[in-house]
Curated annotation (Swiss-Prot):
The keyword Membrane does not apply. Pfam families: AIRS (PF00586), AIRS_C (PF02769). The keyword Cytoplasm applies. PANTHER family: TRIFUNCTIONAL PURINE BIOSYNTHETIC PROTEIN ADENOSINE-3 (PTHR10520:SF12), TRIFUNCTIONAL PURINE BIOSYNTHETIC PROTEIN ADENOSINE-3-RELATED (PTHR10520). Keywords: ATP-binding, Cytoplasm, Ligase, Nucleotide-binding, Purine biosynthesis. Its main location: cytoplasm. The lineage of its organism: Bacteria, Pseudomonadati, Myxococcota, Myxococcia, Myxococcales. It comes from Anaeromyxobacter dehalogenans (strain 2CP-C). Pathway: Purine metabolism; IMP biosynthesis via de novo pathway; 5-amino-1-(5-phospho-D-ribosyl)imidazole from N(2)-formyl-N(1)-(5-phospho-D-ribosyl)glycinamide: step 2/2. The gene is purM. One of its GO terms (molecular function) is phosphoribosylformylglycinamidine cyclo-ligase activity. Transmembrane segments: none annotated. It catalyses: 2-formamido-N(1)-(5-O-phospho-beta-D-ribosyl)acetamidine + ATP = 5-amino-1-(5-phospho-beta-D-ribosyl)imidazole + ADP + phosphate + H(+). This is Phosphoribosylformylglycinamidine cyclo-ligase. It comes from the Bacteria.
Length: 345
């Protein structure tokens, strides 16, 4: 009796079918710099160096974490790809880079072309929002490695910034203004805690008061906001001194990453509204407020630091982009040799 790869759990034909299904999603994301299409050994991108004086490539990689567990339970797979792109492109955008292209890694125990196509549909939508091209990826069918119907995702983004326009926080000074920009919800961090607080006791179709009639699944799977185009538009009008993408570690863990040693950001909690999903997690899980701030973005997905004289212009530029933003604090002198962030309640 002969043995085939399919007998071992890997279906090459299903993989080929997935490629055919995702091409219509990927094709509209392609930029003029892309050479060739999906399916080659490597994605080709001809960087237009004439746009830059000193082009610097910027790369980022990330995943979606256990938010995927919520997608599996809800059997919704068309938005986690947006999360994947957001986690990568937001990281490279905060140094001033324009995202140019994106690649994904999709791994599963038993490949379903339909499920995979839904995931890639979301990835393509994320690339559209970010303005970058989906130029390639990898699909891995790994029998016995994942539970049936489950998968993992990783993403890789590459962008470019002109060296003089790099935003690295070195110009941040005492007295600068901290502006917080609204998140869409939990984004893609803290889901192990959120799931423990909520899903051990409530079904995904439960409707908590304050969530605007949405189910728990709706609130938890709200896609991560992609700030890439907003950051670039703001930089065209305001000399932002620092940005921070608020991910794992929350405000206390991420704001200091972009501040010079000897400074601290002091933020006042009362200055911005918090989406109701955070209150639900805190209340139902009896999570201490400090732990909430160390785990979640608490309503601010992006933070910008500007000089006091640029505060009004920054707010005007953000409003023009349709973003909610608030002046949430200021930069003060801190201890020697370190940068910190404190949230005052």
């Amino acid at each position: 009796m002969s043995l085939t790869y399919r007998d071992a759990g890997v279906d090459i034909d299903e993989g080929d079918r997935l490629v055919d299904l995702i091409k219509p999603h990927a094709r509209p994301t392609l930029r003029p710099e892309v050479l060739g299409g999906i399916g080659g050994f490597g994605g080709l991108f001809a960087l237009d160096v004439k746009k830059y004086r000193e082009p610097v490539l910027v790369s980022g990689t990330d995943g979606v974490g256990t938010k995927l567990k919520v997608a599996f339970a809800a059997d919704r797979h068309d938005t986690v790809g947006i999360d994947l792109v957001a986690m990568c492109v937001n990281d490279i955008a905060v140094v001033g880079a324009e995202p140019l292209f994106f690649l994904d890694y999709y791994a599963t125990g038993k490949l379903s072309a339909e499920q995979g196509a839904e995931v890639v549909k979301g990835i393509a939508e994320g690339c559209r929002q970010a303005g970058c091209a989906l130029i390639g990826g990898e699909t891995a069918e790994l029998p016995g490695f994942y539970a049936r119907g489950e998968y993992d995702l990783a993403g890789f983004a590459v962008g470019c910034v002109d060296r003089p326009r790099i935003v690295d926080g070195t110009r941040v000074a005492r007295g600068d203004v901290v502006i917080g920009i609204a998140s869409s919800g939990l984004h893609s961090n803290g889901f192990s805690l959120a799931r423990k607080a909520l899903l051990d006791r409530y079904p995904l179709d439960h409707r908590f008061e304050g969530l605007g009639g949405r189910t728990l699944a709706d609130a938890l799977l709200e896609p991560t906001r992609i700030y890439a185009k907003d950051v670039l538009a703001l930089l065209d009008q305001v000399p932002v001194r620092a940005f921070a993408h608020i991910t794992g570690g929350g405000l206390p863990g991420n704001v200091p990453r972009t501040l010079p040693d000897g400074t601290r950001a002091v933020l006042e909690e009362k200055r911005w509204p918090r989406p109701a999903i955070f209150d639900v997690v805190e209340r139902e899980g009896q999570v201490p407020r400090d732990e909430m701030y160390r785990t979640f973005n608490m309503g601010l997905g992006l933070v910008a630091v500007v000089a006091p004289g640029d505060e009004a212009a920054a707010h005007a530029a953000l409003r023009a982009r349709g973003l909610e933003a608030w002046t949430v604090g200021a930069i003060e002198a801190g201890g020697p040799g370190e940068a910190t962030c404190e949230v005052v309640r």
